[in-house]
Curated annotation (Swiss-Prot):
Belongs to the glutaredoxin family. PROSITE patterns: GLUTAREDOXIN_2. This is Glutaredoxin-2, mitochondrial. One of its GO terms (molecular function) is protein-disulfide reductase activity. It comes from Rattus norvegicus.
Length: 157
């Protein structure tokens, strides 16, 4: 299965520090160039699972490692969707070497469960942690900081 079919890819647009437009599943970055690759590198032997995970995390402000039938994963995705925040989803049960990626995530985060959620390159936890950060008003500022950082890096280039 291709990366595009296995993951939802969203657009990222930034204007005055506010995230605009785009919905989960929409392809392309509308010229923003902010890590919306639809290339199929998942499972290629030349790159280790950890390297592939790290590349995905560094190229996207929000990454959710999920399983398609997981209710906690759905809850986490809904939080970002309801905040109109775009995110990349990697459905581990739909990629060829999903169990190897889940093992790599375990080594990186200390947990085998899904979802495993990264914001601004930082592991923030699972669904309960994401819900708590959202209720405390801390989740959206983390996302905004990522978009600001990416915008600054793009200006420097």
């Amino acid at each position: 299965m291709s990366w595009y079919r296995a993951a939802s890819v969203g657009r990222r647009l930034v204007a005055s520090g506010r995230i605009l437009a785009g919905r989960r599943g929409a392809a392309g970055a509308a010229g923003s160039g902010m890590g919306n690759s639809t290339s199929s590198f998942w499972g290629k032997s030349a790159t280790t699972p950890v390297n592939q995970i790290q590349e995905t995390i560094s190229n996207n402000c929000v990454v959710i490692f999920s399983k398609s039938s997981c209710s906690y994963c759905s809850m986490a995705k809904k939080i970002f969707h309801d905040m109109n925040v775009n995110y990349k989803v990697v459905e581990l049960d739909m990629v060829e070497y999903g169990s190897q990626f889940q093992e790599a995530l375990y080594k990186m985060t200390g947990e085998r469960t899904v979802p495993r959620i990264f914001v601004n390159g930082i592991f923030i936890g699972g669904a309960a942690d994401t819900h708590r950060l959202h209720k405390e008003g801390k989740l959206l500022p983390l996302v905004h900081q990522c978009y600001l950082n990416k915008s600054k890096r793009k200006d420097v280039e």
